[in-house]
Regions:
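Bacterial Sec-type N-terminal signal peptides, specifically the leucine/valine-rich hydrophobic h-region
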Residues: 13-16
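Bacterial signal peptide processing site
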Residues: 18-23
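Surface-exposed, polar/charged faces of alpha-helical domains
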Residues: 42, 46-49, 53-131, 135-141
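Juxtamembrane extracytosolic/periplasmic "stalk" immediately C-terminal to the first targeting helix
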Residues: 27-35
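Bacterial N-terminal signal peptides that target proteins for export
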Residues: 1-7
Length: 141
């Protein structure tokens, strides 16, 4: 029975040794470049979506103004303002997530506790950026 416990402990320690292991500089550079490329695509998509939504909202406002409907124009203007805030939020979150992806890949160059700390900082930065984006969207920041 003691032999089984020793084998289990040995296997567990070998498995744990592979965790938080630093990647080679070339591997980190490759992964970071890939994360940056993904981040640029994500940012471009979020920005394009926000622009499209804002253009649609502006068209609705212009249509209401052209119809000489003051109440509808006011409603559409409010909707356009909310659409702009949502778009800014989406872009800010995309930027935060993009920065997070790149930061986490850079953390892979570290090992052990330094890697854990680096990833925890990246996670914390992401959470803070998302909260800040929410406050701006909601008009409280």
């Amino acid at each position: 029975m003691k032999l089984n416990a020793l084998w289990i402990a040995a296997i567990a320690s070998l498995a744990m040794a592979g965790c938080n292991k630093a990647e080679s500089p070339a591997e980190v550079q490759h992964d970071t470049a890939a994360a940056q490329a993904d981040a640029q695509r994500d940012m471009a998509d979020a920005t394009a979506d926000a622009r499209e939504d804002n253009a649609d909202a502006a068209k609705d406002v212009n249509d209401a103004v052209a119809d000489n409907d003051a109440d509808d124009a006011a409603d559409q203007a409010q909707d356009a303002s909310e659409t702009a805030a949502k778009g800014e939020y989406k872009v800010a979150v995309a930027a935060a997530e993009a920065n997070h992806k790149v930061a986490v890949e850079k953390c892979e160059a570290l090992s052990g506790n330094a890697q854990d700390d680096c990833k925890n900082r990246a996670d914390s930065d992401l959470d803070n950026a998302k909260r800040q984006a929410e406050r701006r969207r909601d008009g409280t920041g």
